[in-house]
Amino acid sequence: MEDRVLIKNDVTELIGNTPMVYLNKIVDGCVARIAAKLEMMEPCSSIKDRIAYSMIKDAEDKGLITPGKSTLIEATGGNTGIGLASIGASRGYKVILLMPSTMSLERRIILRALGAEVHLTDISIGIKGQLEKAKEILSKTPGGYIPHQFINPENPEIHYRTTGPEIWRDSAGKVDILVAGVGTGGTVTGTGKFLKEKNKDIKVCVVEPSESAVLSGGKPGPHLIQGIGSGEIPANLDLSIVDEIIQVTGEEAIETTKLLAIKEGLLVGISSGASAAAALKVAKRPENVGKLIVVIFPSGGERYLSTELFESVRYEAENLPVE
């Protein structure tokens, strides 16, 4: 047998090909099977690693940025910023990020640990306000470049090229329903498009916070589910591939996230809990008996430990007695 060296050249070669696993312990009453795609297995623990690399590589190929010389500037909820900071560090880019002040402390710490410059913004200015501030910084930064994750076509494209094919391959083409949250819209658009091209009968269900049900025609509002529900319909979301919009409350998302940890052994972020809650609803419908639902878990739980999600166990941990 010929020996093969399987060592990767750099962090970017670790991105993608994340595993899927069946949910087994929280599925009482379900008539369909649910398989979760675990994007916390990415090198920086979220699905946003995919688009961070794709947007950087595309800009490099077009001559828009140069490693060691250019500065990446982006408005982010945290996970895309973490991906950009990681890849930026490995390729020699300075990274400047604008992030809502409501995002978790862990996000700030991780970004600073990766060398990124972080500017916190008031939640009231929304994505548009963040982008305006990013443009202000760009105007003062020679060699600056904004990837624009909300409108960059490489966002959905990388999911069309990787996430969708991985789900199709690992399910042996047996996936019937896709469930995913909507942040920038890229995951649902790219993945859903690929799967529907493979099988037009596959249903795509998207998840949004009940408290900010913009996709359903409601008004934007504050909510607990970090990572989805930006308060507007993102340009990268192709609603033509969406078959159903499912609303999940912050409380439902928190409870399901906790159950995933203590019953399935999966420590995931709150948007994963929201998507799981939606998948459970779909899996209990009689018309879905025997079907396979694939739900995307976008991130791991470690960057939410300071949030309301883990408030009770955090208090317990802080007050454990010394024996």
Curated annotation (Swiss-Prot):
GO molecular function terms listed in the Swiss-Prot or TrEMBL record: cystathionine gamma-lyase activity; cysteine synthase activity; L-cysteine desulfhydrase activity; pyridoxal phosphate binding
SUPFAM superfamilies found in the cross-reference section: Tryptophan synthase beta subunit-like PLP-dependent enzymes (SSF53686)
Record text on activity regulation: Inhibited by aminooxyacetate.
EC number per UniProt: 2.5.1.47, 4.4.1.1
Pathway field: Amino-acid biosynthesis; L-cysteine biosynthesis; L-cysteine from L-serine: step 2/2
UniProt GO cellular component terms: cytoplasm
Coarse class of the protein's main subcellular location: cytoplasm
GO terms under biological process: cysteine biosynthetic process from serine; intracellular cysteine homeostasis; response to oxidative stress; stress response to cadmium ion
Disruption-associated phenotype: No visible phenotype. Light early-flowering and premature leaf senescence phenotype. Increased total cysteine content and increased resistance to pathogens.
Cofactor(s) needed by this chain: pyridoxal 5'-phosphate
Subcellular location: Cytoplasm
Positions of pyridoxal 5'-phosphate binding: N79, G183, T184, G185, G186, T187, S271
Catalytic activity: L,L-cystathionine + H2O = 2-oxobutanoate + L-cysteine + NH4(+); O-acetyl-L-serine + hydrogen sulfide = L-cysteine + acetate
CDD domains: CBS_like
InterPro entries in the record: Cys_synth, Cys_Synth/Cystath_Beta-Synth, CysK, P-phosphate_BS, TrpB-like_PALP, TrpB-like_PALP_sf
Disulfide bonds, paired cysteine numbers: none
Pfam families: PALP
Domain of life: Eukaryota
Signal peptide: none
Modification N6-(pyridoxal phosphate)lysine, positions: K48
This protein's UniProt keywords: Amino-acid biosynthesis, Cysteine biosynthesis, Cytoplasm, Lyase, Pyridoxal phosphate, Transferase
NCBIfam families xref list: cysK (TIGR01139), cysKM (TIGR01136)
Role this protein plays: Involved in maintaining Cys homeostasis through the desulfuration of L-cysteine. Modulates the generation of the signaling molecule sulfide in plant cytosol. Probably unable to interact with SAT and to form the decameric Cys synthase complex (CSC) and is therefore not an enzymatically true OASTL protein.
Subunit structure: Homodimer.
Protein family according to the UniProt entry: Belongs to the cysteine synthase/cystathionine beta-synthase family.
This protein's name: Bifunctional cystathionine gamma-lyase/cysteine synthase
Lineage: Eukaryota, Viridiplantae, Streptophyta, Embryophyta, Tracheophyta
